[in-house]
Amino acid sequence: MNYIEGIEKAFKEYIGENSIDKLKETITKKPMILIAGDQLTGKSTQAKRLSEKYNGKNLSVGTLFREEAKRRGVSVAEQARLLKKERGIDVQIDYSTCKMIGGMGLDADLAVIEGRQPAFMGGFMESLGKEGLVRIYLGCSVREQALRFLKRETTKEDYLFVKEKLPEEDFENLEDVAKEIDKLDIPNTKSVMKAFIDNQNRDEDDRERYHKLYGFDYRDVEGYDVIINTTNKEVEDVAKEIIESIEKHDESWIERRP
């Protein structure tokens, strides 16, 4: 079963037999940029910049997740735990993502949607007739992810010290980079690194869930039109690289600049 069939099967089971017909009704000609990737790769930052560049709406799957938690009367953390054992919440969020990609009701000419699964939901919407999608994957090294987390959660002094001392290598996993940082013997770093691993493990949880439920791996670059490695790059340089890649992939985006 390919992922298109997997998504259709799940939607019919959890949303309803007429769910696909309802999705077709949401399809407009409004183009969409779909950004995916792990946490700390720059998705949110670049989505905001792209929406400003093309005068579009900046939308996030994370917002749908928070809205669903509020509707159910649970915390975001509790809902994340429920996803591990309760089917249906995630399918509803993915269905809402597809409606978002369709563009019906969007109060802008286009949108930039970021999350982990938008590109593959976009692939499903393309199978229903949606056009004008650009699917982008942002990635970076485990070392870079750890440094970005430290920059956010510790002092500037500690961050710069770790950045200078941490070996310039692409660590194989989260635990290896955490152990290397622990060796630097900085106060509170151990607890920060534990939080980093817990935070990043959500990516693996989601990856496993999407594969089991739909049959796709959101890290599979075959599902994307543009792939950007953000390691050791400034925000402005990444934005420039993304824009150039989008407009090379589809020249019509040049005309969409305000």
Indicate residue ranges for each PLM-predicted region:
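P-loop (Walker A) phosphate-binding loop of NTP-binding proteins
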Residues: 38
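ATP-dependent small-molecule kinase phosphotransfer cores
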Residues: 61-129, 142-147, 151-193, 197, ...
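Hydrophobic anchor at the beta1->P-loop junction of P-loop NTPases
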Residues: 35
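Walker A/P-loop
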Residues: 44
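NTP-dependent small-molecule kinase module
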Residues: 2-23, 186-193, 197-258
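Phosphate-binding P-loop
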Residues: 22-30
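ATP-binding Walker
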Residues: 41
